[in-house]
Amino acid sequence: MRLILFFLLFTVMTKVLAQDLQDSSDTEFSIQKFTWSTASVGALSAGSLYGLGKLWYGQQSQISFHLFNDAKNWMQMDKLGHTFSCYHVTRGLDALFSWTGLKEKKSLLLAAGIGLTYFTGIEILDGFSESWGFSLSDMGFNALGVGLYVFQEHYLQAQIFKPKFSFHQTRFAIQRPEVLGSNFIESVLKDYNGQTYWLSFSPGQMGLDKWPDWMMLSFGHSIRGRLKGDAMSYGGITSHREFLFSLDVDLSRLNVKSKFLKGLLKSLNTLKIPFPALIYANGKMNARPIYF
């Protein structure tokens, strides 16, 4: 399921590239662009939901619609993934509809509505699966991701606080490859021990004059030793949280002349740049010279 979400994210980010390849002065509404964009998004959304229903959920036992409380599973790392995905999908959709010339407020509302509707559709599919269920906590974190983008765009007129993602391989996937991934790609999507979700911001974008607006401070959250979603200890290993502080780079603020490269950097701005990091865990502070 996570692979489908990231595929959607990648697809809408390519529309950001299309936006940057256009003349910035071209802001007049185009019915052709709008029709093409909405049709593409609709087809992608419907197609991916249909594919999920047939290829993923079709392999699972189906029962009547029900709720499922997984708020404590994986120490909320999967919830942060929902927030991250919803934020960036909304960001990509807003960029796409802005490219069509749609007015700012309408573009923002349409992007938020489509993003939240899409992720709600996935939760509804979960609701009919015997192995899962409709998760109210998932919906809450979905709304948080959409809301974070909408709030900043509407009230701050800028995306100052940017959710980002990083990953490093861990030894825990080897112990439960069927759950945490049997190869690198699977582990990126499944091994929460190797994932870190960050919130990056630049003091220079908040009024600190001498601070470069491309240099960011970043706060992260990760976990370690979690082998089973609802179990603090498993296989003799006890899990714990990690809170991190590091630096980051706002790739969208780098001074590059190529419109293609500028758009590409904007797309890659979902990823946290490796830097030294301070890590607080189990009441102790540690440092790493480089953290992925």
Please place each PLM-identified region on the residue numbering:
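N-terminal targeting leaders of membrane proteins
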Residues: 5-79, 83-90, 94-102, 159, ...
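Transmembrane beta-strands of outer-membrane beta-barrel proteins
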Residues: 114, 118, 161-163, 213-219, ...
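Transmembrane beta-strands of outer-membrane beta-barrel pores
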Residues: 167-171, 221-227, 251-253
